[in-house]
């Protein structure tokens, strides 16, 4: 049960920011992977703020989140990697749509997009950190 919740949680973080889940899930790995994943996550935080960034619910964005969610979900579920991967995908897809709805509603209310994006960054990072820390 604990692996299932962790997988859903890291998947949700991935749905908000694609590279946050993998960066957190594999932070303890050896080699250059962790640095590459962290750099990709930081790059995503910057790119997300650009007006030209496509919607996360477009096919490519959802596919990237599903793949990252699967890898991250499996990474935090050592006892049940396949179930972890499936739950990571579910969490990522659900959070992608919820995050997009949040941003649409914020825009409708004329809230500052940059501040809303930073809040979403903070939510993704906080969730990912919580999941990884609960894994130890």
Language model: regions and residue ranges:
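Short amphipathic, positively biased membrane-proximal segments
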Residues: 1-136
């Amino acid at each position: 049960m604990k692996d299932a919740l962790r997988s859903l949680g890291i998947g949700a973080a991935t749905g908000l920011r694609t590279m946050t889940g993998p960066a957190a899930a594999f932070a303890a790995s050896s080699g250059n992977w962790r640095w590459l994943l962290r750099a990709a996550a930081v790059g995503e935080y910057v790119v997300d703020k650009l007006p030209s960034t496509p919607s996360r619910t477009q096919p490519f964005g959802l596919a990237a989140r599903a793949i990252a969610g699967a890898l991250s979900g499996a990474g935090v579920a050592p006892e049940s990697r396949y179930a972890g991967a499936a739950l990571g995908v579910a969490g990522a897809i659900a959070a992608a749509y919820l995050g997009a709805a949040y941003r649409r509603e914020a825009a409708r209310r004329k809230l500052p997009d940059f501040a809303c994006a930073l809040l979403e960054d903070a939510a993704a990072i906080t969730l990912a950190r919580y999941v990884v820390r609960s894994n130890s």
